[in-house]
Design a protein with these regions (language model features):
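PRPP-associated nucleotide enzymes
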Residues: 1-113
């Protein structure tokens, strides 16, 4: 996340996630001042969407006007689509094709080879 923020020359805020069990996650954010801004949440995997929805609600409560989420691997199981309605848009790579697929990892893999 900090690399992306550095490349884009934008501020970064890291939220801490602690997994209590297979279905329960506790998210802490500290002070979030995003009033009037566009926020982007980055995560490696979105499964049920619970963590992203919690983070998006924290950002909305902090005054973010728009909230986007992006991930590498989008599973989007159970009621994820409903939970993620708090976000303005969701972007996922093509590692798992789906309704939120917006970008390909193929160029990065080809470059690495």
């Amino acid at each position: 996340c900090t690399l992306a923020a550095d490349l884009l020359k934008v501020p970064v805020h890291v939220m801490k996630k602690v997994r209590i069990d297979g279905r329960t996650v506790e998210t802490t954010s500290g002070q979030v001042n995003v009033k009037g801004s566009t926020a982007v949440i980055l995560d490696d995997i979105i499964s049920t969407g619970g963590t992203i929805a919690t983070a998006a609600n924290i950002l909305r409560d902090g005054g973010a006007e728009r909230v986007f989420a992006a991930c590498t691997h989008g599973l989007f199981i159970e009621d994820a689509a409903n939970r993620l309605r708090v976000c303005d848009d969701i972007l996922s790579s093509d590692t798992l094709e789906g309704v939120y697929t917006r970008f390909s990892v193929a160029p990065a893999i080809a470059d690495a080879l």
